[in-house]
């Protein structure tokens, strides 16, 4: 949770919550800030390449790990803070995060099943307008392998899933 002072353009405060705390404790974060105009940005489950700061809010990007994203939460609001105000706002799901279920069958006669993977070429990031950005990259989710059944299966989340996206099995 990031607070930006809109008058100075500087970051006022940030708070990090664990996923468990966020999902189980509705009062997980309380903070007191002085009167002023603030931009409030909330992010969760973002990749190491994500960039959020007062200087780059216009072109900040949210990236995802190569194994696919967890469900991604994001919200951005601007509000005046007055003495005695109490804020409550919900963190929304990105509209363009898709869950992809993968089941690959027919691999019973393959000796080296661990050498195979499922891959999806997709955008590397989303911007604050919830639009795909950055170059394409190969997402390789971790799949469970069952050599006896000759299958690989699992689920992962991806930020953007165009209908003509190439799927790679290598």
Give the residues covered by each predicted segment.
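Short helix-loop capping/hinge motifs at secondary-structure junctions, enriched
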Residues: 109-111
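Tryptophan-paired
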Residues: 2-50, 113-170
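Catalytic micro-motifs at enzyme active sites that drive phosphoryl/nucleotidyl and oxygen chemistry
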Residues: 28, 88-90
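Structured interaction patches on ligand/partner-binding surfaces of diverse proteins
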Residues: 20-23, 47-88
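Short linear motifs at secondary-structure transitions and domain/linker junctions
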Residues: 15-18, 66-67, 75-80, 92-95, ...
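A short, Gly/Thr-enriched small/hydrophobic beta-strand-prone motif that recurs across taxa
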Residues: 92-107
């Amino acid at each position: 949770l990031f607070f930006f002072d809109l008058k100075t353009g500087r970051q006022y405060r940030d708070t990090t919550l664990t996923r468990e705390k966020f999902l189980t404790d509705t009062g997980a974060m309380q903070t007191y800030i002085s009167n002023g105009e603030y931009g409030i940005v909330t992010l969760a489950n973002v990749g190491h390449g994500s960039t959020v700061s007062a200087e780059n809010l216009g072109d900040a990007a949210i990236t995802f790990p190569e194994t696919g994203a967890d469900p991604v939460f994001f919200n951005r609001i601007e509000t005046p803070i007055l003495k005695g105000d109490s804020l409550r706002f919900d963190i929304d799901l990105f509209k363009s995060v898709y869950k992809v279920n993968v089941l690959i069958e027919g691999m019973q006669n393959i000796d080296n099943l661990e050498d195979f993977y499922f891959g999806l070429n997709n955008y590397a990031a989303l911007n604050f307008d919830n639009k795909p950005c950055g170059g394409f990259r190969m997402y390789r989710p971790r799949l469970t392998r069952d050599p006896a059944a000759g299958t690989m299966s699992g689920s992962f989340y991806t930020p953007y899933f165009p209908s003509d996206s190439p799927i790679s099995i290598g």
